[in-house]
Amino acid sequence: MRPLTGLLLLAAAIAQPAASAAPSASHPLLGIWVLSIPQLGCSETYHFRGDGTSLVKSAEEVSESEFTVAEKPSVKGFYKLEDRVVKDNGKKDCSGEIMQIGSRATNYLRFHPSGARFVMCQDESMQACIGPFERMPAQGI
């Protein structure tokens, strides 16, 4: 029975999405980014780390997520980003919302050729996007 149990556990592990697959060290997303939201008088800071986790500060909210991001852009020029919130301090973000642990999101990133900014879109078009996210010097948030 043990070999069968081990085989089932191995199959389950293989079937899981590669949520822990860290991006390459040269991935353009890694680093600290700021999204300014002037109409709300607020900004959000995103720190995408090399271990596949991110730390976000938005108004009073501080949250942590696990993410996966495509290594290369699609033929349309977008990087697919999948994100799952794993920690949150329960405080309101810039929009007045409170993020729920376990929330998942899939977005598509389009980088400026300079690599210094990107927009985050609902799909692989420029029809529903937020940004620009501006790269910041490496520092803690």
List each language-model region with its residue ranges:
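Secreted/processed peptides and extracellular or luminal domains of membrane proteins
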Residues: 48, 100-101, 127, 135
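Bacterial N-terminal signal peptides
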Residues: 5-15
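N-terminal helix-cap/turn-to-beta initiation motif at the start of protein domains
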Residues: 19-34, 47
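C-terminal partner/receptor-binding element of secreted or periplasmic proteins
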Residues: 124-141
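Short, solvent-exposed coil/turn segments at beta-strand boundaries
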Residues: 29-30, 46-54, 70-73, 110-117, ...
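Contiguous, well-ordered beta-strand patches that form the walls/edges
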Residues: 38-41, 58-115, 124
